[in-house]
């Protein structure tokens, strides 16, 4: 760029307007900028800006915007240069940081009685020839604030140890510092202590689970043994009932055997009686009795000769009575008329009376 560039000679009209301040992240008018009083803000806005004092150039390699990162160190002043204000703004960086850290004024840097060859870079503007009565207010840029290193953060952190870790460290005879960072040896000791604590906790958990499992098994064994005893008592009762039932069955078998034999005997007797009655009754209903004429024609009655020997009651016993008995026993057989021989039946009845007389009767039938 050349110094006589026409667009650089004309100052931008809206550089200090309300819209430009809204772009920079300020919600209020320029009068609300810290470091400027009410009257000073009016003078600042009504200021006549000499276009010849505005120059543009490249930024210095050691700084982002030509402004020193250390706001407290003053720059070398030129003897013939008047007091000036430098207003540096970057809209892109301001919009990114406004959302995170809220409204900030670190993007505006105002320096009094300071002049340095400023060069115009994209996104930066330098305004010179400002009143020297303005209050000097220098704020650092947000982009210049770098995050602290991790070592600095670790140095601010405090080391927290549990009571068990402290106890184990005391047993080991090791004392750890209360703030980080730790040395390699201290880190190894701390890891070793924490590993011991984890192993101890895992062993306690395993023992607790084992104890719970054993307690569960014992409770199950107790329940099973109690149930087994109940079943044994029930089995004994069933055995006694079975024995009593077997005895009753034997008694019933004996009783049924006796009743069956008695029934067989009774039935046998009844059958014999009925058969006898049938033999007695059936001949009277013989079919031959219905023909009396035929029987009378084919069969004729014949007379029977019988002899009776009578004795008197007053007759004494004769001496020939034994001889008579012998003769009667030796009677010969008499042949019958139909050619069949029959024995003569002699019956003698001798009745002895208390008086001594004997009655004898000989009966002979001949057919």
UniProtKB/Swiss-Prot annotation:
PTM characteristics:
Controlled by regulated intramembrane proteolysis (RIP). Following ER stress a fragment containing the cytoplasmic transcription factor domain is released by proteolysis. The cleavage seems to be performed sequentially by site-1 and site-2 proteases (PS1 and PS2). PS1 cleavage may be suppressed by a determinant in the C-terminal region.
Query: In what way does this protein cross or attach to the membrane?
Result: Single-pass type II membrane protein
Q: Lumenal topology: which positions?
A: 289-367
Family annotation (InterPro entries): bZIP, bZIP_sf, CREB_ATF_subfamily
Please list where the region (Basic motif) is annotated: 191-230
A GO cellular-component term linked to this record: Golgi apparatus
The text of the family note is: Belongs to the bZIP family. ATF subfamily.
Task of the protein: Transcriptional activator that may play a role in the unfolded protein response. Binds to the UPR element (UPRE) but not to CRE element. Preferentially binds DNA with to the consensus sequence 5'-T[GT]ACGT[GA][GT]-3' and has transcriptional activation activity from UPRE. Binds to NF-kappa-B site and has transcriptional activation activity from NF-kappa-B-containing regulatory elements. Increases the binding of CREM isoform Delta with CRE. The CREM isoform Delta-CREB3L4 heterodimer functions through CRE but not through UPRE and may recruit HIRA to CRE to regulate histone exchange.
Protein name (Swiss-Prot/TrEMBL):
Cyclic AMP-responsive element-binding protein 3-like protein 4
Question: Which species?
Answer: Rattus norvegicus
